[in-house]
Swiss-Prot record:
Positions bound to a divalent metal cation 5: C33, C35, C36, C49
Function: Metallothioneins have a high content of cysteine residues that bind various heavy metals.
Organism: Thermarces cerberus (Hydrothermal vent eelpout)
Binding positions for a divalent metal cation 1 per the UniProt entry: C4, C6, C20, C23
Binding site for a divalent metal cation 3: C14, C18, C23, C28
Segments for region (Beta): 1-28
Residues binding a divalent metal cation 7, per UniProt: C49, C54, C58, C59
The UniProt record lists the keyword Ribonucleoprotein: no
Pfam families: Metallothio
Protein name, as recorded: Metallothionein A
Similarity comment: family membership: Belongs to the metallothionein superfamily. Type 1 family.
Annotated positions binding a divalent metal cation 6: C36, C40, C43, C59
Length: 60
Protein backbone atom coordinates (compact mmCIF):
# COMPACT_ATOMS: atom_id res chain seq x y z
CA UNK A 1 0.00 0.00 0.00
CA UNK A 2 1.31 3.42 -0.96
CA UNK A 3 1.07 5.96 1.90
CA UNK A 4 1.41 8.82 -0.54
CA UNK A 5 -1.97 9.92 -1.84
CA UNK A 6 -1.29 10.57 -5.49
CA UNK A 7 -1.96 9.17 -8.92
CA UNK A 8 0.74 7.18 -10.63
CA UNK A 9 0.93 9.46 -13.64
CA UNK A 10 2.14 12.99 -14.15
CA UNK A 11 4.90 14.87 -12.41
CA UNK A 12 5.50 14.94 -8.70
CA UNK A 13 6.78 18.21 -7.28
CA UNK A 14 8.26 18.15 -3.80
CA UNK A 15 8.76 21.62 -2.41
CA UNK A 16 10.21 24.18 -4.79
CA UNK A 17 13.08 22.20 -6.26
CA UNK A 18 12.43 18.46 -6.32
CA UNK A 19 10.71 16.67 -9.16
CA UNK A 20 10.13 13.06 -10.07
CA UNK A 21 7.98 11.08 -12.45
CA UNK A 22 5.07 8.67 -12.00
CA UNK A 23 3.13 10.59 -9.37
CA UNK A 24 1.35 13.88 -8.91
CA UNK A 25 1.36 14.82 -5.26
CA UNK A 26 2.74 17.89 -3.51
CA UNK A 27 4.56 15.93 -0.81
CA UNK A 28 6.24 12.62 -1.51
CA UNK A 29 7.50 9.88 0.71
CA UNK A 30 10.15 7.57 -0.67
CA UNK A 31 7.52 4.86 -1.23
CA UNK A 32 5.77 7.21 -3.62
CA UNK A 33 8.76 8.19 -5.71
CA UNK A 34 12.46 8.96 -5.30
CA UNK A 35 12.15 12.69 -4.75
CA UNK A 36 15.20 13.24 -2.61
CA UNK A 37 18.33 14.70 -4.16
CA UNK A 38 20.80 12.11 -5.43
CA UNK A 39 22.77 10.65 -2.57
CA UNK A 40 20.42 11.89 0.10
CA UNK A 41 19.94 9.47 2.97
CA UNK A 42 16.41 8.15 3.13
CA UNK A 43 14.74 8.71 6.50
CA UNK A 44 12.98 5.85 8.24
CA UNK A 45 9.74 7.84 8.25
CA UNK A 46 10.00 8.43 4.52
CA UNK A 47 11.84 11.10 2.65
CA UNK A 48 10.25 14.47 1.93
CA UNK A 49 12.14 16.88 -0.29
CA UNK A 50 12.48 20.40 1.00
CA UNK A 51 15.55 21.63 -0.87
CA UNK A 52 18.32 20.86 -3.33
CA UNK A 53 20.95 19.95 -0.75
CA UNK A 54 21.29 16.69 1.14
CA UNK A 55 21.06 17.82 4.74
CA UNK A 56 18.56 17.87 7.61
CA UNK A 57 16.23 20.09 5.58
CA UNK A 58 15.82 17.30 3.05
CA UNK A 59 14.09 14.82 5.28
CA UNK A 60 11.53 15.04 8.02
Amino acid sequence: MDPCECSKTGTCKCGDSCKCTNCSCTTCKKSCCPCCPSGCTKCASGCVCKGKTCDTSCCQ
